[in-house]
């Protein structure tokens, strides 16, 4: 790390920008100097001037210098915005979110540090040449947090990519060997079939037709049997349902007949006589029990 706390690559980028800014600053200073020189050559030709003439000359010079300085300041601000845009665009390609601290731009200590760095860069006689002329990509700015995780993930993916390449190469070799072996086996099989062609006949078309007819007949018979069983099952289910209904109807008729028989029996003379006799017998039994109770000794 150098004086600004940056690595060599970023320090070279800072030096390039400082050279660019110094060049633009020099051009603007020359423009301001030319304003004064033009004033001297065009207006200061008399030996004496009145107060109004001096005031007019100074006002004109002030307007020109003000315009030049304002133009330079505006251009510098726009240039800084373009520089930040480049950095942010590169950071977004790495899915990074950079942050800036505006208050640090007015830190006198840091500004003096930059000034000393510029002086050292100007006076240094052994500056390293900047060989990298290609457009760089912004690397992670710190070694922790999201940037560190992203860097580790990139390294892991690179290692995995190398492993996959090696594995793919191995698989390609195995596939090539397998294809060669397959070709050899196919050729051997063709040779064997040609050798057996004169010794053994294959299935004839007629045999195949007979086999198809037999299969069709078996299918038809099976379907017929299946249909018969289905019809028999349906018939049995219908008969069972009919029998259940008949059984319920007979049970209901039997129950009604029993009720009717009991009702008719209760209406007969024999039933009434028997009921009357039973009533009398019960009364006699009650009377006898009362009499017996009178003769039983008391405890």
Curated annotation (Swiss-Prot):
Keywords recorded for this protein, A-Z: Bardet-Biedl syndrome, Ciliopathy, Coiled coil, Cytoplasm, Disease variant, Obesity
GO molecular function, one term: protein-containing complex binding
GO biological process: flagellated sperm motility; negative regulation of protein localization to ciliary membrane; negative regulation of protein localization to cilium; spermatogenesis
Matches recorded under InterPro entries: LZTFL1 (IPR026157)
Tissue: Expressed in prostate, ovary, stomach, pancreas, esophagus, breast, liver, bladder, kidney, thyroid, colon and lung (at protein level). Down-regulated in multiple primary tumors (at protein level). Detected in testis, heart, skeletal muscle, thymus, spleen, small intestine, and peripheral blood leukocytes.
Gene Ontology annotations for the cellular component aspect, listed alphabetically: cilium; cytoplasm; cytosol; manchette
Domain of life: Eukaryota
Database matches in Pfam families: Leu_zip (PF15294)
Predominant localisation class: cytoplasm
Oligomer status and interactors: Self-associates. Interacts with BBS9; the interaction mediates the association of LZTL1 with the BBsome complex and regulates BBSome ciliary trafficking.
Disease implication from the record: Bardet-Biedl syndrome 17: A syndrome characterized by usually severe pigmentary retinopathy, early-onset obesity, polydactyly, hypogenitalism, renal malformation and intellectual disability. Secondary features include diabetes mellitus, hypertension and congenital heart disease. Bardet-Biedl syndrome inheritance is autosomal recessive, but three mutated alleles (two at one locus, and a third at a second locus) may be required for clinical manifestation of some forms of the disease.
Name under which the protein is recorded: Leucine zipper transcription factor-like protein 1
Protein's organism: Homo sapiens (Human)
């Amino acid at each position: 790390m150098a004086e600004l706390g940056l690595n060599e690559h970023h320090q070279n980028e800072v030096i390039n920008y400082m050279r660019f800014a110094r060049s633009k600053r020099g051009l603007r200073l020359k423009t301001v100097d030319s304003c004064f020189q033009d004033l001297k050559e065009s207006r200061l030709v008399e030996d004496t001037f009145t107060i109004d003439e001096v005031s007019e000359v100074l006002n004109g010079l002030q307007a020109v210098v003000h315009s030049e300085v304002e133009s330079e300041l505006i251009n510098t601000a726009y240039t800084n915005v373009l520089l930040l845009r480049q950095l942010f665009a590169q950071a977004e390609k790495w899915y990074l979110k950079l942050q800036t601290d505006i208050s640090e731009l007015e830190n006198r200590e840091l500004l003096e540090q930059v000034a000393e760095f510029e002086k050292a860069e100007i006076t240094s006689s052994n500056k390293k040449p900047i060989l990298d002329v290609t457009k760089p990509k912004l690397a992670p700015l710190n070694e922790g947090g999201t940037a560190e995780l992203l860097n580790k993930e990139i390294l892991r993916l690179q290692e995995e990519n190398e492993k996959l390449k090696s594995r793919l190469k191995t698989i390609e070799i195995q596939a090539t060997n397998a294809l060669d072996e397959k070709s050899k086996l196919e050729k051997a099989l063709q040779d064997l079939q040609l050798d057996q062609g004169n010794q053994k006949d294959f299935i004839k078309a007629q045999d195949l037709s007979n086999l198809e007819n037999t299969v069709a007949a078996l299918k038809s018979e099976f379907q017929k049997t299946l249909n018969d069983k289905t019809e028999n099952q349906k018939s049995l289910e219908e008969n069972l349902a009919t029998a259940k209904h008949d059984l319920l109807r007979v049970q209901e008729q039997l129950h009604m007949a029993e009720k009717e028989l009991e009702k008719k029996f209760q209406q007969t003379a024999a039933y009434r006589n028997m009921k009357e006799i039973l009533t009398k017998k019960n009364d006699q039994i009650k009377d006898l029990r009362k009499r017996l109770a009178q003769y039983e000794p008391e405890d």
